[in-house]
Amino acid sequence: MAITAQMVKELREKTGAGMMDCKKALTETNGDMEKAIDFLREKGIAKAAKKADRIAAEGLTFIETNGNDALILELNSETDFVAKNEGFQTLIKELAAHLLTNKPANVEEAMAQTMENGKKVEEHINEAIAKIGEKLTLRRFEIVSKTDADAFGAYLHMGGRIGVLTVLEGSTDEAAAKDVAMHIAAVNPKYIDRDAVTAEEVEHERQVLTQQALNEGKPEKIVAKMVEGRLGKFFEEICLLDQAFVKNPDMKVRQFVESKGGTLKGFVRYAVGEGIEKREDNFAEEVMNQVKGSN
C-alpha cells in the first residue's frame, strides 16, 4: 500500500524515530502501524510506543464522593475557555451528584434519567448547551464502592485535566490513597500489577525483546537471560505496584501502600479527551476546494 506523509508523521510521534527509519518500517510492514512499531523496536531504533492517545478534546474530569461511594466522570466541551465557564462548572457538579445518587449503568441510561428538577439529564445538558453556546458531552463515568475499613483517594490535576480515583483496601488513610492517585496521574500506569497483564501481551513483548537482542548480535545462550531482565523493566513501566514511587523514588508503590497497612484494590484514571481526535482540516486544501467548486 502507499505510505503517506501522515502515516510517517504518526509513526514518528509514537516512536520518536527518524523520518527515513519510519518510512522504511512502514514500507517493510506494508503500512501496518503496530508491526512498524515492532520493526523499529527490534532494530533498536525506537522504544516501546507509549499508549497515551493524542488528547484533542477539551473539558474536565470531576470526582464526587459520598460515604462509601465515589464517582469519576468526564464532561467534554469544544474549547478550554468554556471548560472554565461557571455554567460548565455548575453542570459538571450537578451531573456528578445525580449520577452518584442514582447509579445508572452507563451514559445511555443516565441520559434518560430524570433529575431533581424534573428534567431528563439529556434535556438538562441541552439547556446548558443553549446557554453556553458550545456542544457539551457527558463522555463517561465510573462509580466505585468501598467499605468503612477502606479509603478513597481523589486527585484532580490541573483543575481536572486529569482525574484519578483510587481505593485503598484495609486502610482508612485518605492522604496515602491520594498520594497514590497523584503518582498515577503523573506516571499513567496501565495495570495494577503483573497479574493483570495478559499472557499474550507478555509473550508479544518477549518476542520483540528477543529479536532486539539477537539483532544486537548477542550470543543466543545469554539472550534468554537478557530478555527476562528487560521484561522486568517492561513491567516497571506499565505496572503501578512495580513502579518507583514518585514522592519517594527509593521505594516501590507496593512498599508505600504496604507501609500504610493496606492494599490497592483498584484505580480509575481519566485524561480529558484521551482517544478523541479533533478533525484537522488542511486550510490550503480547503481554499483550493472552494476555488475549484466556484469554477
Swiss-Prot record:
Biological processes per GO annotation: translational elongation
InterPro entries in the cross-refs: EF-Ts_dimer_sf, Transl_elong_EFTs/EF1B, Transl_elong_EFTs/EF1B_dimer, Transl_elong_Ts_CS, UBA-like_sf
Keyword 4Fe-4S: no
CC per GO annotation: cytoplasm
Subcellular location: Cytoplasm
Residues passing through the membrane, by range: none
Region (Involved in Mg(2+) ion dislocation from EF-Tu) location: 79-82
GO molecular function, one term: translation elongation factor activity
Pfam families to which the protein is assigned, alphabetical: EF_TS
UniProt keyword list: Cytoplasm, Elongation factor, Protein biosynthesis
Disulfide bridge positions per record: none
Keyword Protein biosynthesis attached: yes
Superkingdom in the source lineage: Bacteria
Coiled coil: none
Similarity field: Belongs to the EF-Ts family.
Record's function text: Associates with the EF-Tu.GDP complex and induces the exchange of GDP to GTP. It remains bound to the aminoacyl-tRNA.EF-Tu.GTP complex up to the GTP hydrolysis stage on the ribosome.
Protein name: Elongation factor Ts
